[in-house]
């Protein structure tokens, strides 16, 4: 499969996508599609981040977060389907436009960087709750809230990883 082509009205980079979803309070199907791509890309971002350390405990925590990010992408795909937006499956890394060569951020694996990343994950629960509250569909809202609860787990894992690096 080839890399998905993004509609010109959608964010074109992962940085633009993160900024976009952070501002949305009542998501559209297009916003959910952006979220599918961001969540799917985040699996790869966590795997790439894990390459920056040789600490097996930190690697395991980062990989766990990455696996759950892909689960989040699949749940958002389910939201799109439930809301009548058709099929929009989470793409494999090589097909995700937000992972195009050189288009994604990479930061050194330090306790400070992991704590900063954790703040974003903790904010994810509030974002998903806002999105869930705006949806007039109980099944879709429940899927959003499930992702939100796991964002807090991601933040806690990142804090654990920071503590492991601090020894």
Locate predicted features.
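Non-heme di-metal
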Residues: 2-167
């Amino acid at each position: 499969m080839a890399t998905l082509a993004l509609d010109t009205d959608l964010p074109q980079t992962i940085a633009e996508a993160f900024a976009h979803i952070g501002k949305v309070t009542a998501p559209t199907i297009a916003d959910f599609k952006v979220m599918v791509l961001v969540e799917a890309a985040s699996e790869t971002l966590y795997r790439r981040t894990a390459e920056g350390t040789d600490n097996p405990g930190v690697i395991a925590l980062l990989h766990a977060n990455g696996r759950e990010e892909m689960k989040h992408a699949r749940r958002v795909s389910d939201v799109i389907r439930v809301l009548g937006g058709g099929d929009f499956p989470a793409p494999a890394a090589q097909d995700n436009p937000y992972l195009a060569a050189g288009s994604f951020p990479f930061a050194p694996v330090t306790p400070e960087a992991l704590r900063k990343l954790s703040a974003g994950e903790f904010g994810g629960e509030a974002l998903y709750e806002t999105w869930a509250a705006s949806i007039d569909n109980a099944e879709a809202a429940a899927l959003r809230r499930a992702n939100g609860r796991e964002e807090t787990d991601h933040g806690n894992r990142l804090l654990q990883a920071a503590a492991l690096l601090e020894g």
